[in-house]
């Protein structure tokens, strides 16, 4: 399901986005952020992070560097080391 959700984002990034001028006020761009968020966090959490990011993408937000949050590590894997 995750990979299927990434297809429209890839289509936008490679077919539509090059035809438009760069307008994203964030780095990475909103489409790159959405792709990375869904790929790293899954469809539900990554989708929610993407929606929140798109909600911040407006003229009154200064933008800037806004990376995808790191995937939380489980306590059991950190205790095993």
Swiss-Prot record:
- Keyword terms: Cell inner membrane, Cell membrane, Membrane
Q: According to its record, what are the GO cellular component terms?
A: plasma membrane
Q: Where in the cell is it found?
A: Cell inner membrane
Question: What InterPro entries does the record tag this protein with?
Answer: Membr_insert_effic_factor_YidD (IPR002696)
Annotated membrane topology: Peripheral membrane protein
Please name one Pfam family that this protein belongs to: YidD
Briefly, what is this protein's role? Could be involved in insertion of integral membrane proteins into the membrane.
Q: Which family does it belong to?
A: Belongs to the UPF0161 family.
Q: What is the recorded name of this protein?
A: Putative membrane protein insertion efficiency factor
């Amino acid at each position: 399901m995750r990979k299927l959700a990434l297809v429209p984002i890839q289509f936008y990034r490679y077919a539509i986005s090059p035809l438009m001028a760069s307008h994203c006020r964030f780095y990475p761009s909103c489409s790159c952020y959405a792709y990375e968020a869904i790929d790293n966090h899954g469809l539900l959490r990554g989708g929610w992070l993407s929606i929140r990011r798109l909600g911040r993408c407006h003229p009154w937000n200064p933008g800037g560097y806004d990376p995808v949050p790191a995937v939380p590590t489980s306590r059991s894997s950190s205790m095993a080391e």
